[in-house]
Every structure is written in structure tokens, then in C-alpha cells.
Regions:
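ATP-dependent carboxylate-amine ligase
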Residues: 1-34, 38, 43-49, 61, ...
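Phosphate-binding loop of NTP-binding sites
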Residues: 19-23, 43, 57-60, 69, ...
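Generic beta-sheet signal
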Residues: 30, 52, 91, 135, ...
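Beta-strand->loop->alpha-helix junctions that form or flank phosphate-binding loops
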Residues: 50-53, 91-96, 134-138, 233-254, ...
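Acidic-glycine-rich active-site phosphate/pyrophosphate-binding loop
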Residues: 251-267
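C-terminal accessory "lid"/substrate-recognition subdomains
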Residues: 260, 279-280
Length: 457
């Protein structure tokens, strides 16, 4: 079959392209911006890429067009597909029909921690000999791709609540038929497509409805939003994680890089790993619980996590200059910002200075939905630097006014980087947070710090 993918360079659609190629299909694709690393990865697999959406790319006519969720009516390729009656479907629908239908699917859903937890579950199964397939929204550190078919019935997927395509506005995860479902947490997010929390809970309940009776749902025992969702009806086994749940994690040191795994009060494993933070400990416990449903002993799962490497942009060390370390994180919601700062604070100790540098870039952030929660979420930073995005209906100065520590802001990335470099002292830690590239600020900071160090000599 010849498959053409519209919007191929996103992590999810690029992953589907690799799966389709592994199944023996001829695969081509296009995107508005064809760029590395995804373009390099796809071309290595023998997938031809086209820049832009000129309708001529659909000649000769493909057997199937997979339509990415960024495609809209008016796109020349979309219009040609509809006009010529070319068979088409969404990425999640294709994934269900051609990959997931006959697999034991382990799905990881929730507002935060999906990529990390899915990566952990995948690595546990891989390290324990299960050879799983996977599709993850980032490249897990233990692998060099974001998707593969695998060589067993087991398949791990990051189950995203974003919509499927212009013709299917349901959440992607309703297509994923999980037998093991992790529900990490649930908050209001994606304000560009959801009106309120209830709208998101409705989609999550669609997911809960399709877990079989012999399947298992793993969730935190203290998440009221998830409890409300399951109260709408649940027909599967549940395992609760947390203080009053079946599973607990017990920290053995301040930064949570060592912790015990407890099941019904009994110690069943111990994790010593390179990650820090209670949020990662929570993610790891979820992955261990899911792996047990598949058949992995908790002790073996805990040992496997000892060699887990997280995806990029999860408290990733980008470099050091002038005695200052620069970290990068994908955090783009107040809860994630709070957790990431707490993790870094646990790692560096209570007296080291942390400079938090934030770009409010997600659609929810830009709309100002959670702006009132930003100042409290930044509380563990000693100094805060905010980028003012253009064309948004609020000012980051409002957040600055609500912060208790010194805050600086600018609408220019270069100016903001200079402010951070000027404030940074040897021994400080800079944490950059954004779900985008932030104008290359990480390298600007490292270059500026190196110049500052040279000038001081």
C-alpha cells in the first residue's frame, strides 16, 4: 500500500510513518516545515518528504492519506483529498486499525508525565525481555526512535487527549483500546479545544469505557478530578497509587533518586536511578504497577528503572559555564512548573540559587487560563525571568507583581538572556521552561556566561 502522511514531521505522525514503513508500506509525507531531527530519522527509513502542501504531491494518487490534526479545511492537499475522493483517515484511527487492534495495549494518559511514564513502562518491558512496540511523544533516552512495532503482543502508547483531525474532534486516545491504562492525573489544559474541566473529563470517561472488564486502570488515590471521572462508570479493575492506595513509594533520600516500592504495605522493590523529584517517583510507581499487570515482577521492574534514561527536555542538563549550570525542561503548566522546580530544589539543596526562565507558550498559557497560578508555581525559584509573548491578551507583568521574589521580564529573547546572564553567579542553577525552542535561549545563556567568565579572568 502507498500511504501519504500530511503533517509528517510531528513526533506522533513521524512515529506512525516509521510503523507504516516497518509494516512494509511505501510511505511518503509532507509538512509545512521539514526539518531535523525528524526529517533525518524518516529519510533514513526510506521515507520521501515534501516541503509544503501543494496538491501535486497527491499524483500519482496514494492508496491512503493519513491526515494530521494540524491540517484544516482550505489546505490544498485536504481539499484535493476530498475533491478526488481519495481514501483518508486520522493518525489514531490508522494506528488502531493497522497496529493496535490485536495487541495488549498499555496506555498512559493524564495531563502531566505521559511521555516520561510511557518511556518508563516501555523500558521496563524491554529490559525484562518483553520486546514491546511503542509510540511515545518524545524519543525515550534508552531508544533512538519515538516509535517501533516491537516483537511481542505488548504495545506501550502515550495516550494524548488532543483531538484527532478536522473531521474527528474526539481525543486521540479513544482509538487506543487499552488493556492496561495508567491515568497519571487530570487538570484543565488545552483551553484551545476544551471549554472546561468537565469537557476533558467527558473525553477521559470515553477512554475508561473501552477498557475491558479483565483490564486494569491504575490511578492516584488522591486525584479528585479522576475520581469524578470514574464515578461516571467504571467496568474494569482499579489499582490505586498513593498513601491510602495499593501502591506506595517511600523516599530514601531528599531528592527521590532512591526509593522503595510498597504493595499492600509490603516492600516489593527498590529503585536507585538518575532521575530526581517526587513527580518522577510517582511516574515510576505507575509504570511498575502497569508492568505487573503485564506480568513483570515489581522487583524486576524496579531494577530496570535503575538504568532508565528520560526523554530529552525533562530537567535536561544543557551545559555549564562560569560555574553556572543550565537546565532545560518541557514544563508549560503551573503544576509541571511547580514539580520541576521542586525536583531541582531537591537536587541542588536549599541554599543554592535557582533562576527560573519561563516562556508562556502553550495555547492554555497564551489564553491566560492559568496565569493566576504561575506566581505560586514559581515559588521555589530565587529569581524569575519571564518572556512576554506577542499577541496575547495579558501581560506577564501581572505575574511579576504577584511573585514574592525578584522578577524580570522582556518581550525580546536576547534582552531576557542578557538579564539572566547579568544576574547569574557561580554556583547558580538556571532552569529554562518552555514547550518550544524559546528562541535558542539555552545556547545564548551558555555563550553569555562563557563571555562573562572570560571577562572575569
Amino acid at each position: 500500500m502507498r500511504i501519504h502522511i500530511l503533517g509528517i514531521c510531528g513526533t506522533f505522525m513521524g512515529g506512525l510513518a516509521m510503523l507504516a514503513r516497518s509494516l512494509g508500506h511505501e510511505v511518503t509525507g509532507s509538512d509545512a516545515n521539514v526539518y531535523p531531527p525528524m526529517s533525518t530519522l524518516l529519510e533514513k527509513q526510506g521515507i520521501s518528504l515534501i516541503q509544503g502542501y501543494d496538491a501535486s504531491q497527491l499524483e500519482p494518487q496514494p492508496d491512503l492519506v493519513i491526515v494530521g490534526n494540524a491540517m484544516t479545511r482550505g489546505n490544498p492537499c485536504v481539499e484535493a483529498v476530498l475533491e478526488r475522493n481519495i481514501p483518508y483517515m486520522s493518525g489514531p484511527q490508522w494506528l488502531h486499525d493497522f497496529v493496535l487492534r490485536d495487541r495488549w495495549v498499555v496506555a498512559v494518559a493524564g495531563t502531566h508525565g505521559k511521555t516520561t511514564t510511557a518511556g518508563m513502562a516501555t523500558w521496563i518491558l524491554e529490559a525484562c525481555g518483553y520486546k514491546p512496540g511503542f509510540v511515545i511523544g518524545g524519543v525515550p533516552g534508552n531508544f533512538d526512535v519515538s516509535a517501533r512495532l516491537g516483537d511481542s503482543p505488548f504495545f506501550v502508547i502515550e495516550a494524548d487527549e488532543y483531538d484527532c483531525a478536522f473531521f474527528d474532534k474526539r481525543s486521540k486516545f479513544v482509538h487506543y483500546c487499552p488493556r492496561t491504562l495508567i491515568l497519571n492525573n487530570l487538570e484543565f489544559d488545552h483551553a484551545d479545544i476544551f471549554d472546561d474541566l468537565k469537557a476533558i473529563q467527558k473525553q477521559f470517561h470515553h477512554l475508561v469505557r473501552i477498557v475491558p472488564g479483565q483490564g486494569r486502570i491504575i490511578l492516584p488515590e488522591n486525584d479528585i478530578n479522576l475520581k469524578q471521572t470514574l464515578a461516571m462508570g467504571c467496568w474494569s479493575e482499579q489499582e490505586l497509587v498513593g498513601e491510602q492506595g495499593h501502591w506506595q513509594a517511600k523516599k530514601l533520600n531528599a531528592d527521590a533518586s532512591e526509593w522503595e516500592v510498597l504493595l499492600d504495605g509490603e516492600k516489593v522493590g527498590e529503585v536507585k536511578w538518575g532521575l530526581v523529584g517526587e513527580h518522577n517517583m510517582h511516574n515510576g510507581l505507575m509504570a511498575i504497577a502497569a508492568a505487573r499487570h503485564v506480568g513483570v515482577l515489581p522487583a524486576d521492574a524496579a531494577n530496570a528503572l535503575g538504568t532508565f534514561i528520560n526523554a530529552r527536555r525533562r530537567l535536561e542538563l544543557r551545559g555549564e559555564a562560569h560555574g553556572v549550570t543550565v537546565y532545560d525542561d518541557f514544563a508549560h503548566h503551573p503544576t509541571a512548573i511547580l514539580a520541576t522546580l521542586a525536583a531541582l530544589r531537591g537536587k541542588v539543596g536549599g541554599t543554592a540559587r535557582i533562576l527560573a526562565v519561563l516562556e508562556p507558550r502553550s495555547n492554555t498559557m497564551k489564553m491566560g487560563i492559568c496565569k493566576d497560578d504561575l506566581a505560586p508555581s514559581l515559588g521555589r525559584a530565587d529569581e524569575v525571568f519571564l518572556l512576554q509573548p506577542q499577541h496575547i491578551p495579558w501581560q506577564v507583568a501581572e505575574v511579576a507583581d504577584a511573585c514574592i521574589q525578584p522578577v524580570h521580564w522582556s518581550a525580546d529573547v536576547d534582552v531576557l538572556a542578557d538579564m539572566v546572564v547579568k544576574a547569574a553567579q557561580p554556583g547558580d542553577h538556571i532552569l529554562v521552561m518552555s514547550n518550544g525552542g524559546f528562541g535558542g535561549i539555552h545556547q545564548k545563556l551558555l555563550d553569555g556566561l562563557a563571555k562573562k567568565a572570560a571577562a572575569a579572568e
